[in-house]
Amino acid sequence: MPNKALITGFWSKVKVDEVGAEALGRLLVVYPWTQRFFEHFGDLSSADAVLGNAKVKAHGKKVLDSFSNGVQHLDDLKGTFAELSELHCDKLHVDPENFRLLGNVLVIVLARHFGKEFTPELQAEFQKVVAGVASALAHRYH
């Protein structure tokens, strides 16, 4: 179980719009096969196009708003993400491996934004959180 006080205290400093936009953008650039779920977002032809795309930025914020809700409900991640798990499984048919990839990208983006403040201890706690969120989002698939 992650250290709730450490996670929530740190998370209050995160600029969800910036970090969300960068995390989703990086996912789409580093793992280009994930772009197939976002073809309706327009130009995703290059890293600059992806990172500058307003729809990518807006959806990245939406993703991190949901993650923020999870941070507030660490004791019930499955319940917190039940509807999103159903949506991504039954309607969108997203490969659940993508949740793990996005979680790892999020940790990288947090480290980039916070530098030395994102200590190894904090990273270890966030790895637990992103693994828990990925598992909760993949729950419907099992």
Swiss-Prot record:
What PANTHER family does this protein's entry cite? HEMOGLOBIN FAMILY MEMBER (PTHR11442), HEMOGLOBIN SUBUNIT BETA (PTHR11442:SF42)
- Globin domain sequence ranges: 1-142
Function as written in the Swiss-Prot or TrEMBL entry: Involved in oxygen transport from the lung to the various peripheral tissues.
* Other observations noted: This type of beta-C chain is found when anemia has been experimentally produced.
InterPro entries hit by this protein: Globin (IPR000971), Globin-like_sf (IPR009050), Globin/Proto (IPR012292), Hemoglobin_b (IPR002337), Hemoglobin_oxygen_transport (IPR050056)
Q: Name one GO biological process term.
A: hydrogen peroxide catabolic process
One Pfam family of this chain:
Globin
Key words of the record: Heme, Iron, Metal-binding, Oxygen transport, Transport
Q: Which GO terms describe its molecular function?
A: haptoglobin binding; heme binding; hemoglobin alpha binding; metal ion binding; organic acid binding; oxygen binding; oxygen carrier activity; peroxidase activity
User: What is the primary gene name for this protein?
Assistant: HBBC
- Protein name as annotated: Hemoglobin subunit beta-C
Family from the record: Belongs to the globin family.
Annotated Gene Ontology cellular component terms: blood microparticle; haptoglobin-hemoglobin complex; hemoglobin complex
